[in-house]
């Protein structure tokens, strides 16, 4: 099969492109700057989503589009950054859609990234793909609009899969990398009670789920999370036991952080990302036959 990956030079895209090539597939990657072609089955093409420009050759012979494009949420949530976080996701989908309308192609499916940020925080509720509740937060709105935009591909008879991604465990990026960096400095931090539920997934499982969905023609929503979520405290404990043991453990009650977070404009970021508390189910992807490499944190040891 031939894949086109948007956001293919990012954390997930890099890992996914390697997996696809290792499994005998060909990969086209859309990027803002052209890169050297170092593999006969890996090609780069230039696009600019804000200007809606794209190299139309990127879609030649492509069977599946994997959409990972979007500005990182791990930034200060200023008004301009919030606008970029939303628009970068919508513009990427619009640019691909525009190309597919104009140029004849053989694309059968688009697998689009999403996030569990669409689900509201809750202490005990378990969220499945058919849950109708939408988080009334900035990130909840971003994910809702992101998924809504992806559904335009159904108008041109393209099968659509949407993966709601949890906290990605990777040493090379995301929140896990930030926690690991603190740990390597000898600091372990617990925010609030530390009991907030973290629905995580190892990056190797995540990219394998993208491949699994693509080759098995699975439509609709899928939660991209591991079967066994953990508390924030358990996540920190795992980092400490598997990596360098910290010499300083800090605990911050939420009330202590409220004013500083507000002054820094980080209240929304805390509620949506750092203080996230949601238990998300992996039952659907397991019932479809996917076997997790890392079903629980203890398997990471």
Question: Can you say where each PLM-predicted feature lies in the sequence?
Answer:
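NAD(P)-dependent short-chain dehydrogenase/reductase
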Residues: 152-162, 166-198, 239
């Amino acid at each position: 099969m031939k894949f086109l990956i948007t956001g293919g030079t990012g954390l997930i895209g890099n890992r996914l492109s390697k997996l696809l090539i290792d499994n005998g597939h060909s990969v086209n990657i859309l990027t803002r700057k052209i890169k050297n072609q170092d593999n006969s089955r890996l090609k780069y093409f230039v696009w600019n989503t804000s200007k809606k420009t794209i190299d139309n050759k990127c879609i030649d012979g492509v069977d599946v589009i994997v959409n990972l494009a979007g500005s990182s949420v791990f930034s200060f949530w200023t008004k301009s950054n919030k606008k970029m976080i939303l628009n970068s996701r919508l513009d990427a989908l619009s640019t691909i859609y525009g190309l597919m309308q104009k140029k004849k192609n053989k694309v059968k499916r688009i697998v689009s990234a999403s996030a569990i940020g669409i689900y509201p925080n809750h202490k005990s509720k378990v969220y499945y793909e058919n849950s109708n509740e939408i988080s009334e937060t900035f990130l909840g709105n971003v994910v809702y609009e992101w998924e809504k935009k992806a559904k335009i591909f159904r108008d041109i008879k393209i099968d659509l899969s949407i993966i709601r991604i949890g906290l990605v465990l990777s040493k090379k990026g995301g929140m896990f990398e930030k926690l690991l960096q603190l740990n390597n400095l000898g600091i372990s931090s617990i925010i609030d009670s530390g009991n907030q539920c973290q629905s995580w997934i190892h990056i190797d499982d995540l990219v394998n789920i993208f491949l699994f969905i693509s080759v098995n023609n699975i439509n609709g929503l899928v939660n991209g999370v591991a079967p066994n979520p953990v508390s924030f405290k358990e996540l920190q404990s795992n980092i400490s036991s598997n990596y360098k043991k910290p010499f300083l453990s800090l605990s911050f009650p939420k009330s202590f952080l409220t004013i500083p977070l507000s002054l820094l404009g980080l209240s929304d970021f805390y509620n949506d990302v750092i203080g996230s508390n949601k238990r998300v189910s992996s039952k659907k992807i397991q019932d479809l036959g996917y076997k997790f490499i890392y079903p629980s944190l203890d398997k990471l040891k």
